[in-house]
């Protein structure tokens, strides 16, 4: 089958296990039916001929066939599970490798819930198709064939009855499988529900704070209602065919057989007719189980096909913006140049043919309305985004010509929401430079104004962040992040809203830390606090992805352009006070 060709591509060295599973399971299927052949011979000898001398011989053969069949089926299942777990592992590894290669734009366009669900859940969906369906499929398709042969070998009547039952049952089962379009809608709604649920759970703290109800989260509520509709419709579509199917195999044969048994004496060979009825019972049961396996196989194979297609689609999206690096390991200087740079998030164009240059060892501030491209420019400078057109150059060469290590080594970031790991304060800073000694780490902490933070705790710099009783404010976390950047000592520093949420108690210490961090560096900063950028070397004003003004604070104020208006709005907002107005 096509789906197994796709799956086996991810386990090239173990696909022989799959073929081994099919062979062993096929032998098991043959032995099952062969066991029923010996049952027929036993019944024929005992019932028709009244000969019990060979009963022990046939009984032994029945036990041997069915036992070996069960053991071989068990072995095929164990082997197929080994292959399935290896496949799941390789699919997840491929996903993780793709994530490490993907540009940051991929993560901006795809939620973490969607990525986790697509990789983890879809990898798990392939398990059933390989671990269970691989051995089951062989039996499901071969057992009916062997059973048909045995039925006609018994008699023409048994063969015709079994064929008619199989055809009718097959038609009924087709009504239970659902069409591909419906199954695709069902799977898509399930994917959407899983993704929205993950995002909902990750935001549960905010949800509880505001006492929000599920209905207020329209995306999650709609996905739940949509999935419930498809699940209910699918259940209803299966109800009638499944009841009829059960009735035919479990009820109809019994209903017909009871009155028929009263007329056995009027039949030419009633004893053989009785044996035929018993074999119809046996063979119809075997075929019923096989057909149910076929139904589940078709569903699980469809799920596996959908899963592998979803994974490969995600892998392709990861590769679309795969970052490429060069061999240049040294920056001649740290002048920055945007040369006709274009960039978009999906279909949304953010920058188009943007050009400007920044001199090394100067401090620049990016200012503009929300959506003007400030954060995008900062992100592009990181080297972890692939531009749609143009080039970003540092030291006269495009970023794509430098090694990944060179970019990481020479560019530092301080963001508004700095991430600290559940390690000691010391380790959180030291990871910026693994070769730095203890003295350098402690000096970086001191320059970032972290001395008073360390003194609060009994274990000082060895205090584990996130452990019981250890709480850090936003400003304290930010200072530790700045210490990390100071220790890294990169020539280029990018600060995106680094002081946006800092309280008054921390602002003074933070500004001192910023001063130590920015010394003799090329600094690009984004800040909503206009007071924090008045003393920078140059302010660059952006609107709709274009530079419309640039200069120092005084010259831009005199110009009376967008910067002047933004500064005026900031001062007005800063002077706003709650008076004697009644707040509702």
Where is each model-derived feature located?
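Membrane-integrated ABC transporters
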Residues: 1-31, 54-58, 80, 125, ...
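An intracellular "coupling" helix at the cytosolic face of ABC transporter transmembrane type-1 domains
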Residues: 9-16, 104, 121-130, 134, ...
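Transmembrane-helix motif of ABC transporter permease domains
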Residues: 16-35, 47-88, 274-282, 289
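ABC ATPase nucleotide-binding domain helical subdomain, centered on the C-loop/LSGGQ "ABC signature"
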Residues: 93, 393, 401, 426-467, ...
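Cytosolic ends of transmembrane helices, especially the final helix of ABC transmembrane type-1 domains
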Residues: 193, 212, 236-239, 287-316, ...
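C-terminal portion of ABC ATPase nucleotide-binding domains
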Residues: 512, 529, 534-584
